[in-house]
Amino acid sequence: MCKTYYVDPQTGRDTNDGLTPEKPLATLFAVNRLTLAPGDTVLLKRGSVFEKQFLQLRCCGQKDSPITIAAYGEGPAPRIDADGQGLWYQDYGCALDAPTHVYRGYVSSAVLLYDAAYVTVRDLELTNRADAVIGEQYSQPDKLERTGVAVVAKDRGTRCGITLQNL
């Protein structure tokens, strides 16, 4: 049976089951602990800001039953402001096409879909800011790489069915 989870940082609690808008979860950390199944939906409250939070999902929907991350309610899109959190390690195993492209090291992503398939992420605002330094390049070797969304296919072969809309 498909489940819908609600997340509202203002009225929620991570001790709630999150299965109704009246008893939502409070944080994305609680969402990261969920075991999402095909057809499940996670809805973030519009107008909410998830500061220093991130989504790291290792889940698979099905072609006819994707897992969906979206918004509910009225107001502006919910904002995930990772602010350098959401760390994961990348290693492509070899240098890439440009010396400025970091191929090994830690990355911060507001949303990480790791070995995921048939997942839709839509109607969210994603930020992952860093204080800018004049003259500093985006991909300096000593600077943490930050992304809004990262999709990684590593241990399960080619992944498909990833949909990103209105981000």
Per-range role (PLM):
Residues 7-45, 51:
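Acidic Gly/Asp/Thr-rich repetitive segments characteristic of extracellular carbohydrate-active
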Residues 51-53, 106, 119, 128-130, ...:
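Surface-exposed loop/turn segments connecting beta-strands in extracellular beta-rich domains
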Residues 60-142:
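Right-handed parallel beta-helix/beta-spiral solenoid domain characteristic of secreted/periplasmic
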